[in-house]
């Protein structure tokens, strides 16, 4: 079977510039390349050839300008059984016209069906041209069916995942060695390390962590905040917000480190060097993949109860979940707890790692996607298994897992 992945026009695949979608694609590609004739379309990048076949995968990199039209031309010249469009519903109709005999699966990684993103008529047209929609969280699924109730039967949650081999938990010999190496690299061997990793954007909330440092340092004068990321993935240039962050950090210059952009393959090492990771999202986060990463690394996790974050992180079971997400004092209080309540942190991190091992690896994500593909290609099989396919979990059983972990 011929399968096509169509990335967005934002970042290239493979994920040489980072990006949650691109990292997910990289993660599931080995599974699908061993089962299908897989072609991946993405934008050009100076570090990547225009076309190549690598590890059995055909990569086609097209100019960012007129990208969607260039993809459509490629589709016209090919014959794919199934086309997976990532996070660009408004491109679906164009691709369907270019390849009318192909089945189309659309995956949503943001609130792409909102009134701000498309008209009601455009949404109807998308639904007319897709065979199935997948979403990265129940939260995103609800944003679709609240506006388009008729989409409920074709909209399925497919959670993302991580590569466990890249995240040896901190309590293992390998994880401990990485932790020691990276703490030495940044000169923080004897510090209490708070980690933020992500785009430097107001919606991600790093400014709140800087604001919280005054209170944190009163209680923990050896604390250090490591802010890893740039204004736009691999773009380390400064904008007004980044300048604001640096100015805000000046009073704590000996306690805040800006690493700038970190390549995707180096991200796991930062999680291992941290004593606590904070996902300070202010917007309705679809479901931040950093939550999976922290849990996989066995790093104590603090996240905000925004969007889909609370679907995979349960308060005091696999992490600390903050409801008062826009208050520096809330972060300071949670971070203090992470530093002082070691019994709870040890319990949560072990639970979190088991949680990821059971449900949130890239193999789990790929198998869930494959079930979607097979249901599309084999219409008679209308029964769609629950999101947690490989262990026969459903939502009630995952809640039972949390209850069991908490007792």
Curated annotation (Swiss-Prot):
The keyword Glycosyltransferase applies. It comes from the Bacteria. Keywords: Glycosyltransferase, Transferase. It holds the Pfam family Glyco_transf_4. GO terms for molecular function: glycosyltransferase activity. Signal peptide: none annotated. GO terms for biological process: biosynthetic process. Its EC number is 2.4.-.-. InterPro entries: Glyco_trans_1 (IPR001296), Glyco_trans_4-like_N (IPR028098). The keyword Glycosyltransferase applies. Belongs to the glycosyltransferase group 1 family. Glycosyltransferase 4 subfamily. This is Putative glycosyltransferase YtcC. The lineage of its organism: Bacteria, Bacillati, Bacillota, Bacilli, Bacillales.
């Amino acid at each position: 079977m011929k399968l096509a992945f169509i990335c967005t026009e934002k970042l290239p695949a493979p994920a040489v510039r980072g990006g949650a979608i691109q990292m997910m694609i990289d993660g599931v590609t080995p599974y699908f390349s061993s089962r299908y004739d897989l072609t991946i379309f993405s934008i050009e990048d100076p570090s990547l050839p225009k076309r190549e076949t690598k590890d059995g995968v055909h990569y086609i990199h097209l100019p960012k300008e007129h990208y969607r039209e260039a993809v459509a031309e490629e589709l016209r010249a090919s014959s794919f059984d199934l086309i997976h469009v990532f996070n660009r519903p408004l491109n679906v109709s164009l691709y369907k016209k270019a390849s009318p005999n192909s089945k189309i699966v659309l995956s949503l990684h943001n609130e792409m069906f909102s009134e701000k993103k498309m008209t009601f008529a455009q949404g109807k047209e998308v639904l007319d041209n897709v065979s199935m929609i997948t979403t990265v969280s129940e939260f995103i699924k609800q944003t679709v069916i609240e506006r388009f109730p008729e989409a409920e039967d074709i909209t399925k949650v497919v959670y993302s995942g991580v590569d466990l081999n890249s995240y040896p938990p901190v309590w293992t010999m390998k994880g401990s060695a990485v932790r020691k190496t990276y703490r030495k690299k940044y000169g923080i061997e004897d510090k209490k390390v708070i980690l933020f990793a992500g785009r430097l954007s107001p919606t991600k909330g790093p400014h709140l962590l800087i604001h919280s440092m005054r209170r944190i340092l009163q209680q923990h004068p050896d604390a250090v905040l490591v802010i890893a990321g740039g204004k736009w993935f691999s773009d380390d240039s400064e904008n007004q917000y980044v300048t604001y962050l640096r100015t805000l950090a000046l009073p704590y210059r000996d306690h805040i480190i800006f690493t700038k952009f970190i390549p995707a393959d180096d991200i796991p090492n930062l999680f291992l060097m941290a004593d606590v990771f904070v996902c300070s999202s202010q917007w309705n986060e679809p479901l931040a993949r950093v939550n999976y990463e922290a849990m996989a690394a066995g790093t104590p996790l603090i996240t905000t109860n925004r969007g889909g974050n609370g679907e995979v992180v349960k308060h005091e079971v696999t992490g600390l979940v903050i409801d008062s997400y826009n208050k520096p004092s809330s972060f300071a209080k949670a971070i203090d707890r992470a530093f002082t309540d070691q019994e709870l942190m040890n319990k949560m991190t072990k639970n979190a790692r088991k949680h990821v091992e059971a449900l949130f690896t890239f193999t789990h994500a790929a198998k869930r996607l494959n079930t979607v593909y097979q249901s599309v290609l084999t219409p008679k099989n209308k029964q769609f298994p629950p999101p947690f396919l490989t262990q026969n979990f459903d939502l009630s059983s995952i809640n039972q897992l949390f209850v069991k972990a908490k007792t």
